[in-house]
Amino acid sequence: MNVILPEVGKPPFATFYLLHGLSDDHTRWLRQTSIERYVEGLPLIVVMPDGGRGFYTTHHQGHDYARYIAHDCVQFVERNFPARPRRQSRCIGGLSMGGYGALRVALGYPDLFVSANSHSGALMIGSRKRQKDRPLSEWEFNAIFGRNPAGTDHDLLHLATNALTAGRLPKIRIDCGVDDFLLESSRTFTRRLDELGVPHEYEEYPGEHNWAYWDEHIRDALTFHAKHMRLKAD
């Protein structure tokens, strides 16, 4: 886990949990983007945990990465850093696998996070149609999600509907590059959100599935989260 602590403001601070992608680890956001510079002036802790290749969900066979983020990481951070322990002061985001993971955790634990964002997310896990560009082998996919994740807690549409019905839906922001191989996944997912009446923001920008895109658009995510957590730059 890497943590950026604010140099401005008075504690306790809001917290942004920032999740990496499938082939990455907890160091990549710091090594590949200017996230530390972008949060200068914000009273915001940034927490970058390691999720392995686990998709931040509760595995069909084995590990519970969703609980690890929502309980273990949140409790560790709030016991050891000056983090404000309330929903209004927690947000979560990520890229690719982490984009799915951010929505999976926020929608699965809607009492914990006020907002969630996904960059270039692999969002249609619940689809029965196998994606030709899915970055997992069939064995690995089934070990994590099972053979038919539709309608389960791996299915973001299922979780979003439940959170909406309960009146605890986090604010949602999704973006994707127009040359990203996951663009159709983002378009299909947001179209289904519209059909289900789930409020969200969706943007498409020039760009591919790479760090140049994520470095640019993490700033949009910070603006989004700061608005919903009512943060003001110093």
What feature does the model see in each segment?
Residues 1-234:
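Non-catalytic cap/lid and distal C-terminal segments of serine-dependent acyl enzymes
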